[in-house]
């Protein structure tokens, strides 16, 4: 059995207006290497971008890894570490008997986590955490760049902040 590569991933999402133009930012660190990823969407929500950031990061990995994934989104972290288990058992219905919002991204994030060992960490946003601040900048710049790409899963009647 081989030892898994260990890396750190930092993620953030941004939305102007919520809903409005949005973007995500990712900083991935492996040993002395750093990779940044970001993109923007014409109409989306902050929570969708907070979910998309770790999805993009995890989907970029070609082999199973041991990951410390850090975000300032309690929604994303609690969703993937706590709420998702009940949602899956109840066929993606919440404890209040409503359909899970952003279910397309929750399913995608769940699938993206399966081959990795992930420790999910939370940091307070806008509190001087260097990598989180960089992700915030990447996400905001992507959102401000007048993106034309559609967030195909965004449904105004179903999704919310």
Curated annotation (Swiss-Prot):
Q: Which UniProt keywords apply?
A: Cytoplasm, Endonuclease, Hydrolase, Magnesium, Metal-binding, Nuclease
Cofactor stoichiometry and binding? Binds 1 Mg(2+) ion per subunit. May bind a second metal ion at a regulatory site, or after substrate binding.
What CDD domains does the record point to?
RNase_HI_prokaryote_like (cd09278)
Question: Cytoplasm as a keyword?
Answer: yes
Locate the residues binding Mg(2+) 2.
Answer: 12, 136
One cellular component term (GO) for this entry is: cytoplasm
**Catalytic activity annotation:** Endonucleolytic cleavage to 5'-phosphomonoester
Q: What is its EC number?
A: 3.1.26.4
Q: Describe the task this protein carries out.
A: Endonuclease that specifically degrades the RNA of RNA-DNA hybrids.
NCBIfam families recorded: PRK00203.1
Q: What is this protein called?
A: Ribonuclease H
GN (gene name): rnhA
């Amino acid at each position: 059995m081989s030892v898994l590569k260990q890396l750190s991933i930092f993620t953030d999402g941004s939305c102007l207006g919520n809903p409005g133009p949005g973007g995500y930012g990712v900083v991935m660190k492996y040993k002395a290497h750093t990779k940044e990823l970001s993109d923007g969407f014409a109409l989306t929500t902050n929570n969708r971008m907070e979910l998309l950031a770790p999805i993009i990061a995890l989907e970029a990995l070609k082999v199973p890894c041991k990951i410390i994934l850090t975000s300032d989104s309690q929604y994303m972290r609690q969703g993937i570490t706590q709420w998702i288990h009940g949602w899956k058992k109840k066929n993606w219905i919440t404890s209040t008997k409503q359909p899970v919002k952003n279910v397309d991204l929750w399913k995608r994030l769940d699938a993206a986590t399966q081959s990795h060992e992930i420790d999910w960490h939370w940091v307070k946003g806008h509190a001087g955490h260097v990598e989180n601040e960089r992700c915030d900048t990447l996400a905001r710049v992507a959102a401000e760049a007048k993106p034309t790409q559609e967030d195909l899963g965004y449904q105004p009647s179903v999704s919310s902040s």
